[in-house]
Amino acid sequence: MSEQERIQECLRKEIRSLLISTKDGLTPQQLEKEYLLMVGNHLPLRILGYRSTMELVLDMPDVVSVCPCGDGTVILKAIPDESTKGIANLVAKQKSNHKVRNSMQKGRASVCSGPSSRRRVPYRGRVPPILPAVVKSELKDLLALSPVLLSDFENAFANRFGRSFQYVQYGFLSMFEVLNAASDVISVEQTRAGSLLTLKKSVSEEKQRGWPAAKGKIFTQPFRMKQQGSYPIGFPVAKACFSQPTSNMEPPKQILGMERNSRSNVMETSRLNHSEKLNQLALTLQSWVVSHYGFNGSFSSAKKHKAMYTLRKFTENLMVCCLFNEYMLIFKEQLSPKKLGFLNVIELVGALSDILHVEFREGEQDLLVFDADMKPLASVQPDKKTEAKACVSSPPRNSLSTAVIKETTWDCPSKNHKEPEQKIFKKPNLVVKPLQLQVEINKSQLSLAVANHDIPPDAVRDKKLCRLPPLDTSTLVGVFVEYILSPSQFYIRIYSRDSSELLEDMMIEMRRCYSNQLVSDRYAMPECFIQPGHLCCVRISEDKWWYRVIIHRILGKQEVEVFYPDFGNIGTVQKSSLRFLKCCYTKLPAQAIPCSLAWVRPVEEHWTSRAVLQFQKLCGLKPLVGVVDEYVDGILNIFLCDTSSNEDVYFHHVLRTEGHAIVCRENVPSKGFRDLNPLALYTKSSVTPEDIVLKELGYHSQQHYFNEDREISPQSKESDLYTLDEIPTGMPYLESVTIGDDIWDENWLPLQAKMGKESDAASHLFTSSLGGKKPYPSCKEIPQKDWCFSTPKDIWDDSWQPSGLVNGMKVEVQIPEGLGAQEKHIDTTRIQKQSNVKSASDSPALPKLEEFYISLIQSQQSAEGSQFEPSNIQTPPKQIQLSSTPTLVNSGSVEGSPESLENEDFSSSSAITVFKDTSQGAVDQLSLILSPEHQISQKFYIPRSTATAALGAAARLATSNSLLHWYPSVKKMET
């Protein structure tokens, strides 16, 4: 028996013992208190997986009997078993304690009362109370603004009306009863945040309202025609037409006709069974109440007569506001829509549509009211270019503004005239969605509807989303793999505060905005705007969240295929669920990034289903660590690593181990994205193409993206230099360097020390300053712009401190210490001349020193060492030090004369030349060339002032293998 089963079995015995000892039973709250007093701990609800005490006892039908009471409380009584029947009989024979009973009743009253009431609720009958019309109107007014969570209802009601919602004074014992009483206007939806109170759509749009005529002409709402089948036989429903004036009928005759029809209806239903009789009677009573008192049952016929009397005192048209003022002056009674249960004046006037005729005219700021009997309406002439106004009959209460409505007549024909086929002409530019009617619209009206459709001003029409800016090479990012087609075609989403959290905040705001029925109807997309490439939003019915989508293609009359730019997948949705996207929701770039797994390719031509399934299992629904490699045709090639376990799992290594992939040292372009890349098709780049610079690092497959303020000159000719060794076949160390850009292996991103095979190639790389001679005349052929580099901002060597910048370009050359005295004074005019020459050249800037990669190079040039002339290069064989004194190089030649060099301290005679090569198109490329003595040696000396953190993981590993040595400290000699 498991621990949970043992706890549950023990709990069953304890609850049975507690309830058996109580003759009258306990409430759930009393059971919790008694259990705490007896055991000393609370009920183990969470351990057993229950959320409440009632859920626990309902799961014990053989232990607890739930007995509901008439006042709404629940009493829990024990069900004895074979071993406790004797005890239960003894307890049942005990006399009841009146003190305990009174205390229990007080406890029940305190539990049932709301938080705002401390007094005892009087006993009531079994019939639940009716929610007053005023309270219902307040609830509709509150929820008309936006849906409210049940937990926030008290605060929202207090902020709206300045008082707390005291449901106890209306006769309710709990908020649950209030919601049941208001179920015709309020719906409760379960969300992740809790119960969400929303206004029912049927009430908000007034689609289900309709009243039979009570006085004067026979009048019916247009949407009433859809509900003819729901009313009993014998109740005539008039149809609307556009011809013939109305024939007046007296109210007494109509009432008698209704009574006769109801009697005949009762005679017909007497043969039915009892349940059908009750349903028929309920429908009859409902129709009679609606016809006499209106939909809410609060507008009586007496008030209708008073309103009619007030209206008939004026022969001319009367505004709605004047009607209410005159009503108050005549009858000394205020006609308040709130007190009568209506949300606003428009809704109240709509309830009087059988006696009032309402028009809206251009230039008027209010509705005009006429007597429906005294003002016959002319029929609409289709050949005349006159716009008529529709009769406002219970308009939607959620209308954002008073819309321009066409005038129509809903008059009935004479007795001897047959009803012609009804046609309804309505203007299409209503603010809210019009009522769904059985109408016939010709082609001209349809084109007019498309032209005059009212589009919200902040709706997105032709705007495109931006893509995320490219990531730098070697960047470590946290990612979620959102959509997978294959290891060479999948989408990721970056997990960070600037991306994923902003996306979540935007989706929460979209849900809060579009969940309001007013906004949802306002931003509904018409058919003419549903075109491929249009940016909009849609709600997924499964999770009720709103997503940004881009229409990919139209599948039919009802469905479209959309692309989700934040997640990368493609799905099918209904056209009716599409909504215009607000412009404020386009600021966040598309979060999906098309990716391909770096350095892998399938064993065969295409990825197998097992390989795709294995890749999906590796990704899962968890955050991963991604290491950026490069961009190929706009597709990010990235390494993925799972760090959730004790050992890091590299996906490319797993696919290679299981035989699904072949690891290669270059990235193959993705065929899937080459065929279809919706993100590149429907979005735009966040930066201009000239701001993105592609950098080649050693071999053609390595590319790098720099900042926007860097530029590159196009390739002009092939370089005469070549790379050193072949790329190693081993996998790179996915570990980042602690400064600068993240590097994992010096061999994977080697520093390109490009040396020529011939002696003249090496002569380009060295300079000498012995006696002002020019032993290397071939240096004249080197362009000046190839000798310039930008001063780095972050210096990781203390000895490297360049000063005296001229145009931001420096070249470092070291000369023997003996020449230091000749370099004390420098001609400033020559420096100015050199700066002018350098400014004229268009030399791009090299990368920062934090992008300087340390590479362990085993020299294979020992045979070429004889080509150099050691006599011309005065260098100590065991000392290499980076000079802190930069010098200027003449554009014509590289001289070592005192006029061309600026010297402060020279402690080494070795020449270390840092240059830039642009002939091959290699941008900001650094080369570190050693003397022949050091090229033969396999030891690489660096100054001790260099921080160890500047070396990569592989460099630190090489230090332990004696491949890299610190240069011994040598004091500077005084001259």
Curated annotation (Swiss-Prot):
Functional description taken from the UniProt entry: Required during spermiogenesis to participate in the repression transposable elements and prevent their mobilization, which is essential for the germline integrity. Probably acts via the piRNA metabolic process, which mediates the repression of transposable elements during meiosis by forming complexes composed of piRNAs and Piwi proteins and govern the methylation and subsequent repression of transposons. Required for chromatoid body (CB) assembly.
Keyword terms, alphabetized: Cytoplasm, Developmental protein, Differentiation, Phosphoprotein, Repeat, Spermatogenesis
Segments forming domain HTH OST-type: 7-80, 127-202, 299-373
Segments forming a coiled coil: none
Protein name: Tudor domain-containing protein 5
Entry-linked PANTHER family: TUDOR DOMAIN CONTAINING PROTEIN (PTHR22948), TUDOR DOMAIN-CONTAINING PROTEIN 5 (PTHR22948:SF19)
Predominant location: cytoplasm
Region (Disordered) location: 820-843, 864-905
Presence of the UniProt keyword Cytoplasm in the record: yes
Family listed: Belongs to the TDRD5 family.
Modified residues (Phosphoserine): S891
Pfam families: OST-HTH, TUDOR
Biased composition (Polar residues): 831-842, 864-894
Places the protein is found: Cytoplasm
Organism superkingdom: Eukaryota
GO CC annotations, alphabetized: chromatoid body; pi-body
UniProt xrefs under InterPro entries: LOTUS-like, OST-HTH/LOTUS_dom, SNase_OB-fold_sf, TDRD5_LOTUS_2, Tudor, Tudor_domain_containing
Entry's Gene Ontology BP terms: P granule organization; spermatid development; transposable element silencing by piRNA-mediated DNA methylation
Organism whose genome encodes this protein: Bos taurus
Domain annotation Tudor: ranges: 529-588
SMART domains in UniProt: TUDOR
